[in-house]
C-alpha cells in the first residue's frame, strides 16, 4: 500500500493513489550491497531523481508544473571535440539547446547529469585517447571546478551501442585519459559514469571488454526505453545490473522514456511503462533514475518511427501519479540538504 494525498490508496477512492499503488515496492536483497570506489551516492533506501534533457524540454517541464518540486538533478549533453554547451549555449541543427551553466544558475541545490558524446566514428574516441583533445578535457575540468556541485559524467554514453561504433580498446583508452586528466587538474566534484546501451552490443563484443576498470568507474548506468514495457528489462540490461553488483558499483538509469508515447485520456503509459520503471528502481535498488520528458517526434532523424510524444504534460492523470510517487521521501529532489545527502561538500 502507498499513502498518498487524500489518505491510503483504495480508501476514499483516490484514483491517483490507486495508480501509484500499482508500483511494486519490494526490494531484491541481492541488489543491496556495499559500494566500493564511488562518489555522491544517495543514502540507503533513497534514489536521486533527474529530469532532462534539453534546455527547451526542461523549461517546458518547469513551466508545465510550476507548483511541483524540482528534481534533484537535470540532464544535459555536450561532446568532444568542443566544450560548447558547458558554459555557453550550444544549439544543434534541429534547434535543441544545451547549456550546463544555465541549469546551474537557474536551479540552486541541484546536480548535473552530463552526457559526453564520444563516438567511434570520425576517430573521435581514437583521437581523444591519443591526446588530440586534451584541451577539451582541461576546459571541462576548469569549468567543473567553478560550479561547486556534483556532476555525474557519462563518458562516451551508450558505449556499446551499435550506433556509436566504439571499438572497446579505443573507448577504454579515451575514457581513462579523460579521467586521468581531470584528476591531474584537481577536479573533485565529478562522478564518472559507465553507461551501457543495455541492448545487443556493437559487433557482439562482451560487455566487460569496454570496462575501463574499477578505479575509473564510480557508477554503472543503463538506458531503458522499450525495455520497460514489461516487468523484466531483458537479458542485456540484466547483465549490466549483474556486472555492477559484481564490481560493487551503484546503478543509475541514465536515460528513460515511455517511447511509444503519453496520450491524453489514456492511462496505458502509466500501467505498462511507468509502473515498471518505478518498480524496477525499487527491486534493483537503483540509486539514481533519469526521465527524459521529450516529444520523440522532434527527434525523427534519431529514433525509430514508432516513437511518439512522451511528455508528462500530455496527460494530467499520469502527471499527477508521477508527482505523487516522486513526492515520497525516497526520491531526492531539489533541496538545501541534497548535497549533504549525497556526501558532497562544496
Positions of predicted regions on the chain:
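Ser/Thr-rich, Pro/Gly/Ala-heavy low-complexity intrinsically disordered linkers and tails
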Residues: 1-18
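N-terminal substrate-binding region of glycoside hydrolase catalytic domains
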Residues: 16-132, 258-261, 290-291
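Substrate-binding cleft of secreted/luminal carbohydrate-active enzymes
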Residues: 19, 24, 28-57, 151, ...
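Acidic (Asp/Glu)-rich catalytic clusters
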Residues: 61-70, 94-113, 139-149, 209-215, ...
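Aromatic- and acid-rich polysaccharide-binding/catalytic face
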Residues: 69-81, 114, 207-232, 254, ...
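Substrate-binding cleft of extracellular glycoside hydrolase catalytic domains
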Residues: 77-200, 307-314, 326, 334-345
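Glycoside hydrolase catalytic-domain groove-lining segments
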Residues: 90-111, 215, 219-262
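Aromatic-lined carbohydrate-recognition surfaces of secreted/lumenal glycan-active proteins
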Residues: 179-205, 250-262, 290-294
